[in-house]
Amino acid sequence: MATFQILLPYNYSPNDRKAIRFAIDAFAGRREARVTLFHAYTPLPTIDVTASPENVKMRSGMTYLAAELKEKEEALKVVEDMLLEGGFDRDAVTCVFEKRVKSAAEEIVDRVAGCSVLVLSRGAGKVTHFFTRSIYARVVTALRGVTICVAS
């Protein structure tokens, strides 16, 4: 029996919820399905507050951003719980929350290595797509040999 290694990139959008729902509907309960829930976050800059008195003012902003990052990590755990409640076995779900080094699209392409299925959601907004090529488009054009499911 072939194993379905599924990558679920997650970026906290309503469309990403559709991708989660699709993965549950399509693959939950299948013993051969393994899911990696993945989010790569933009790292916070390191600020030396002793270098300048102006840098001290940034401390509260950085504290806020660090707290927001922690909330996002906890929110990803909630999504992991949704997958478990949806029918995936605990040992079949891996949650990855890591610092982004490359572009979001490149991180997804790197992470999908070894996976047989990628579940994406389409980004919303024609205006946004006009100004920046969507992550969805960059990932889809870069991949070969992976089944791509698009929840929209």
Model-predicted regions and their roles:
Residues 57-74:
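A short acidic, glycine-rich active-site loop
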Residues 53-56, 113, 138:
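Short, hinge-like loop/turn segments at secondary-structure boundaries
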Residues 5-7, 34-36, 94, 118, ...:
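A structural signal for isolated positions on well-ordered beta-strands in alpha/beta enzyme cores
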Residues 142-152:
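Short, flexible loop segments at boundaries between secondary-structure elements
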